[in-house]
Design a protein with these regions (language model features):
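Short, charged amphipathic recognition helices of the HTH superfamily
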Residues: 1-10
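Short phosphate-engaging motifs
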Residues: 2, 122-123, 189, 193
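Alpha-helix N-cap/helix-initiation sites
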Residues: 3, 16, 20, 137, ...
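RNase H-like nuclease fold core
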Residues: 9, 13-20, 25, 29-117, ...
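Conserved phosphate-chemistry cores used by DNA topoisomerases
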Residues: 28, 44-47, 82-85, 98-102, ...
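Conserved beta-strand -> loop -> alpha-helix junction used to position metal-binding or nucleic-acid-contacting
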Residues: 114-121, 126-162
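Acidic/histidine-rich catalytic cores and adjacent linkers
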Residues: 165-286
Length: 286
């Protein structure tokens, strides 16, 4: 939202005429708040880290271009969701992600047990170079989301149910059998779905080595989807942002509002924490 947009909204909604200069001065204060928030100290350990990306439009030298807005969402030892930072980039890659992960480490993170990513190019290598003991796992929520991206609405429910039979399997072997069954049922109509799962299987199958309580936290944590839905509602009417600073302002304010609702720990967190204590005993802090 530009300064002129804010000025117009205030006039339309409240019949208040505020100068562009005053609005600019007020919103510049938000950037200082964002800077302090983005540099705040973080916890020593985050059992789970999720990374997500939203693509928005931004103006640059008179033309509209894509900007990727990356969000890092951590789950604390208390089971609370915490947004760790916002980063804006034209492209993703190993160098970009190495900078992000190094920044998180410099802000105090000493260990991440499981990092859930969306097949982001260069991210697994970056996190493994900074946190070599972290298990990088393809995010099941993202994988399902990408699977149904081009599926007809009438087929989505059935597709999701059949995909669930894969990621809720008790063992990797059972999951492979479920994937084979999925392929036999759907490959004629949607061949790319089973192909995508097989192509990414190396980053999926470690999931089946986790105890059920940890698995539930990974695939039922809907914070990523909630963030996406809430943010898209805000940005879908904005058109192109005037610059990167305006993207930061809007996302920060929106995310601050969303985070106020994160008052309770993740459901079944105590059971998951006990399993983390067993599985990562040498790295676990009481």
């Amino acid at each position: 939202m530009s300064v002129r947009d804010i000025q117009s909204s205030l006039l339309d909604m409240y019949q208040i005429d505020v100068s562009e200069g005053l609005i600019s001065q007020a919103t510049e204060g938000i950037l200082e708040e964002v800077k302090a928030w983005q540099n705040r100290p973080l916890d020593n350990i985050y059992p789970i880290l999720f990374l997500d990306c939203i693509v928005v439009k931004s103006r640059e030298e008179g033309r509209v271009c894509n900007r990727s807005v990356y969000l890092a969402l951590g789950v604390t030892m208390e089971g609370q969701k915490e947004l760790l930072g916002i980063w804006i980039a034209q492209t993703e890659g190993a160098k970009f992600w190495l900078g992000v992960i190094t920044e998180l480490k410099n802000r105090g993170i000493k260990d991440i047990f499981i990092a859930c990513v969306d097949g982001l190019k260069g991210f697994p290598e970056a996190i493994e170079s900074v946190f070599p003991d972290t298990q990088v796992q393809l995010c099941i929520v993202h994988l399902v989301r990408n699977s149904v991206k081009y599926v007809n609405w009438k087929d989505r429910k059935l597709i999701c149910e059949d995909l669930k039979s894969i990621y809720t399997s008790a063992t990797e072997q059972e999951a492979e059998m479920a994937l084979d069954a999925f392929g036999r049922k759907w490959d004629a109509k949607y061949p790319t779905i089973s192909q995508m799962w097989r192509r990414n299987w190396q980053r999926v199958f470690p999931f089946f080595d986790y105890p059920e309580d940890i698995r539930k936290v990974i695939y039922t944590t809907n914070a990523i989807e909630s963030l996406n839905r809430s943010l898209r509602k805000i940005i879908k009417t904005k058109g192109a942002f005037p610059n990167d600073a305006s993207i930061l302002k809007i996302f920060y304010l929106a995310l601050s509002h969303i985070a106020k609702k994160w008052t309770m720990p993740i459901h079944t967190w105590k059971a998951a924490l006990n399993q983390f204590a067993i599985r990562f005993a040498g790295r676990f802090e009481v």
